[in-house]
Swiss-Prot record:
Gene this protein is translated from: psbC
Species classification: Eukaryota, Viridiplantae, Streptophyta, Embryophyta, Tracheophyta
NCBIfam families: psbC (TIGR01153)
Propeptide: 1-2
Residues bearing the modification Phosphothreonine: T3
One GO CC annotation: chloroplast thylakoid membrane
Keywords: Acetylation, Chlorophyll, Chloroplast, Chromophore, Manganese, Membrane, Metal-binding, Phosphoprotein, Photosynthesis, Photosystem II, Plastid, Thylakoid, Transmembrane, Transmembrane helix
Name the record gives this protein: Photosystem II CP43 reaction center protein
Source organism of this protein record: Gossypium barbadense
Biological process, per Gene Ontology: photosynthetic electron transport in photosystem II
InterPro entries: PS_antenna-like (IPR000932), PS_II_antenna-like_sf (IPR036001), PSII_PsbC (IPR005869), PSII_PsbC_sf (IPR044900)
Transmembrane segments: 57-81, 122-143, 166-188, 243-263, 279-300, 435-459
Length: 461
């Protein structure tokens, strides 16, 4: 099937003759060499953690405390700040040392992982089954595979509980909704009611509902992690103690490539959900660090000009816009008072700077006339001018704007990158699922090389 370009590159047990895969097929050569595959995975983890540590230190070195994080192209420090490290009231950075510590810890960890990866790739045993049966496996061994699945689930559950412990006991996390403009606080009364937590999963994904992406208080987020961590840990114990049922043995393909396809499918779903979360959610991804969401920037613009024109004498409750609808305020189909104009489509935005001006029926006209605070005006003007729009050449804002600034929101980068990676992972899922099913059905060899059309064509040279 494959062409070997250079036989001298081959290593024992990893060449085309013994594995059926050439050097460029990567880890496919290691499908049946558990020791070498371990080395590849540990080394890969080392590269990932090295990037995290190095990029972390790079961001610390370039960080300017006087500017918001989202103006500095940062994607790692906002995550650390959201976890409550180094920030105070209003999301102001008061100490960058925790960020430095995080970078150094990741660099040190990556050195350990790098050593382990090189050791297992070059020096360690080719296979683990003989010497270390606990760590050895055969891809067809369904019982062993579900045990490995269980161990992974327990580790994921522990990860979820790490966030819970940080929020409850280790200094708390940043809450953008804290009174007075956001602050780090310990989460005391978790939401553990299953009807609330699982109610998110049953919501519609569309406007005004927003599925799990609509979560807007930290009690629910941390409570959700308690539920998820518990489910992962108990599910992990279950999978370690049990063997797959007959229906699962029949329904699933039990091969290394099949497991790869399942994993890629799961990661793809994670990528798409993360994309929606970082784009729309300003509680898990506070606007103080990531910049405003798209709807938030749009509503902020409407609010900013409502404030300006009200000062100039406009009656914002009755002014008509060019379409005959309200220029500043209008009613949604269900009767709430919402901002008028193009931003009406973002009527369901919730943001800490806007909610104090709402009453039981949407925006409260008397509060808009009497209660707008200077901090709300400043915040909305700032968000209006930092919309998560931007082109590849890093000129942010609306594409036709002549006074554009050199700004692209981290929200744009994080949402776009997770969408693109989620898509690639989905294609990889389809590819490997197709190959795994074909192999299980016994026709994985592909097209017949003896009658390939290219063989009857004139050579290129």
């Amino acid at each position: 099937m494959e062409t070997l370009f250079n036989g001298t590159l081959a290593l024992a047990g990893r060449d085309q003759e013994t594995t059926g895969f050439a050097w460029w097929a990567g880890n496919a050569r290691l499908i049946n060499l558990s020791g070498k595959l371990l080395g590849a995975h540990v080394a890969h983890a080392g590269l990932i953690v090295f990037w995290a540590g190095a990029m972390n230190l790079f961001e610390v070195a370039h960080f300017v405390p006087e500017k918001p994080m989202y103006e500095q192209g940062l994607i790692l420090l906002p995550h650390l700040a959201t976890l409550g490290w180094g920030v105070g009231p209003g999301g102001e950075v008061i100490d960058t040392f925790p960020y430095f510590v995080s970078g150094v810890l990741h660099l040190i960890s990556s050195a350990v992982l790098g050593f382990g990866g090189i050791y297992h790739a070059l020096l360690g045993p080719e296979t683990l089954e003989e010497s270390f049966p606990f760590f050895g496996y055969v891809w067809k061994d369904r019982n062993k595979m579900t045990t490995i699945l269980g161990i992974h689930l327990i580790l994921l559950g522990i990860g979820a509980f790490l966030l819970v412990f940080k929020a409850l006991y280790f200094g708390g996390v940043y809450d953008t909704w804290a009174p007075g403009g956001g602050d780090v606080r310990k989460i005391t009364n978790l939401t553990l009611s299953p009807s609330v937590i699982f109610g998110y999963l049953l919501k519609s994904p569309f406007g005004g509902e927003g599925w799990i992406v609509s979560v807007d208080d930290l009690e629910d987020i941390i409570g959700g992690h308690v539920w998820l961590g518990s489910i992962c840990i108990f599910g992990g114990i279950w999978h370690i103690l049990t063997k797959p049922f007959a229906w699962a043995r029949r329904a699933l393909v039990w091969s290394g490539e099949a497991y790869l396809s399942y994993s890629l499918g799961a990661l793809s779903v994670f990528g798409f959900i993360a994309c929606c979360f970082v784009w729309f959610n300003n509680t898990a991804y506070p606007s103080e660090f990531y910049g405003p969401t798209g709807p938030e920037a749009s509503q902020a613009q409407a609010f900013t000009f409502l404030v300006r024109d009200q000062r100039l004498g406009a009656n914002v409750g009755s002014a008509q816009g060019p379409t005959g609808l309200g220029k500043y305020l209008m009613r949604s189909p269900t009767g709430e008072v919402i901002f008028g104009g193009e931003t009406m489509r973002f009527w369901d935005l919730r943001a800490p700077w806007l909610e104090p001006l709402r009453g039981p029926n949407g925006l409260d006209l008397s509060r808009l006339k009497k209660d707008i605070q200077p901090w709300q005006e400043r915040r909305s003007a700032e968000y209006m001018t930092h919309a998560p729009l931007g082109s590849l050449n890093s000129v942010g804002g609306v594409a036709t704007e002549i006074n554009a600034v050199n700004y692209v929101s981290p929200r744009s980068w994080l949402a776009t990158s997770h969408f693109v990676l989620g898509f690639f992972l989905f294609v990889g899922h389809l590819w490997h699922a197709g190959r795994a099913r074909a192999a299980a059905a016994g026709f994985e060899k592909g097209i017949d090389r003896d009658f390939e059309p290219v063989l009857s064509m004139t050579p290129l040279n």
